[in-house]
Regions:
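Beta-strand C-termini and the immediately following turn/loop, strongest in propeller blades
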Residues: 3, 52-58, 96-103, 107-109, ...
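Residue-level detector of Asp-centered blade-edge/turn motifs that repeat once per structural unit
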Residues: 46-47, 91-92, 142-143, 185-187, ...
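Repeated scaffold domains used in trafficking and secretory/extracellular systems
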Residues: 37-41, 83-88, 128, 133-138, ...
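Solenoidal tandem-repeat scaffolds enriched in leucines and small polar residues
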Residues: 131-213
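Multi-bladed beta-propeller domains
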Residues: 15-35, 66-83, 109-132, 161-177, ...
Length: 366
């Protein structure tokens, strides 16, 4: 018997960050791994009716949502083989998109009925490993029509775009490696994708034309964790551990965003604030203005996550190609804003199990 639609009573508890005074709400509490979607993927629908997360409480990763109206936690899926970092809620709140096996799926958030959206054939939707392209993240355009999914045909990486209206799809790009694809929030005909670790920052048009490098890294530079800045047609990236930079995708102009050791940074919907976790050293979640060329940081709270990944403490490790690393993603905070900017969702394993949290953002950061 399927456990889809099972409701769990609210597990919410409130606490105050002892160093910043911020109000922190723990959303999940079961003794299992939980995490929200990756940092550049929204965890909420636009109306904030639900907070979507992944829970292992049933013994395998399944999609769940916290309902705002009731506080209940609702199990949305009961399906084997879900790629837990492929999760992408639709902006209109109707569906959550995800991959399982070699197929694309979506689940109706009201009925918990899952439907197949695409069958990609004899392919691998994830590469080996814990980071980058191995995570299997997907991207949904701002209007919820276009869904970008990466898979591998043998050694060849393929980027497919699915039309969610008629469920047709086509491969728009084939190359050596593709990961972390993201639609531009202001132009659903344009995508960023991460290429090789030594040459990461690329753009491609939704129809497959215009594949081009946006940034060429300097020797020894560690470029990672790219994300769009809404309203500006700029792509920001982490220049680890020296801060963040941004590039105008039309002019190619490059600028400094912040010098704080931002690790995973996400923009607020209006593009006027970013939030980032930090590591080596972990100085907590940092808020800053990404538009003023300074990005002076203010500490929001301290997730106290284990943030595993010892390779981040040293120089760029991928000069001679990929290397094996131990960096379980559920140990990383991956903060991101709610659509209205009133709170930030993050994950922390500080209790011994990875749980989902929200922290309130004060009015002084409006």
């Amino acid at each position: 018997m399927s456990s889809r639609g099972t409701r769990f009573r609210s597990e919410s508890t409130l606490a105050v960050d002892g160093r910043t005074g911020a109000t922190v709400r723990q959303v999940t509490a079961a003794p299992a791994i939980h995490h929200h979607p990756f940092f550049f993927v929204p965890a909420y629908d636009d109306a904030m009716r639900r907070l979507v997360f992944v829970s292992h409480r049933t013994g395998a990763p399944q999609l769940f949502a916290e309902e705002r109206a009731s506080g209940d936690l609702v199990q949305l899926t009961d399906q084997p083989g879900i790629a837990e970092w492929s999760v992408h809620p639709s902006h209109d709140g109707r569906f959550v998109y995800y991959t399982a096996g070699a197929e694309g799926w979506r689940v109706d958030c009201t009925t918990c009925e899952a439907e197949q959206v695409a069958v990609f054939g004899d392919v691998a939707l994830r590469e080996q490993g814990m980071v980058g392209a191995a995570m299997g993240t997907t991207a949904l355009s701002r209007d919820d029509r276009w869904w970008a999914v990466k898979f591998n045909e043998g050694p060849v990486a393929c980027l497919a775009v699915v039309d969610t209206r008629d469920r047709s799809w086509e491969v728009i790009l084939r190359r050596d490696t593709i990961g972390h694809q993201q639609f531009c929030p202001d132009d659903d005909t344009l995508l960023f994708y991460a290429g090789p670790l030594t040459d990461r920052v690329w753009l491609v048009n939704r129809d497959g034309s215009g594949n081009r490098r946006l940034h060429e890294r300097a020797p020894g530079q560690w470029v990672t964790h790219e994300t769009w800045l809404p309203g500006r047609r700029e792509l920001a990236f982490v220049d680890w551990p020296h801060g963040m930079r941004a590039i105008d995708v039309d002019s190619g102009a490059e600028r400094q965003v912040t010098t704080v050791n931002a690790w995973h940074a996400a923009s607020r919907r209006d593009g006027r604030r970013m939030v980032a976790d930090t590591n080596f050293p972990d100085i907590g979640l940092q808020l800053f203005d990404p538009t003023d060329g300074v990005g002076a940081p203010t500490t929001l709270c301290h997730p106290a996550a284990s943030s595993l990944g010892a390779h981040w403490a040293g120089p760029f490790p991928y000069a001679d190609g990929p290397v094996a690393v131990h960096a379980p993603q559920h140990t990383h905070p991956h903060p991101s804003f709610a659509p209205d900017g009133s709170r930030v969702v993050f994950t922390s394993d500080r209790t011994g199990f990875a749980q989902v949290y929200e922290v309130t953002v004060g009015e002084e950061f409006a």
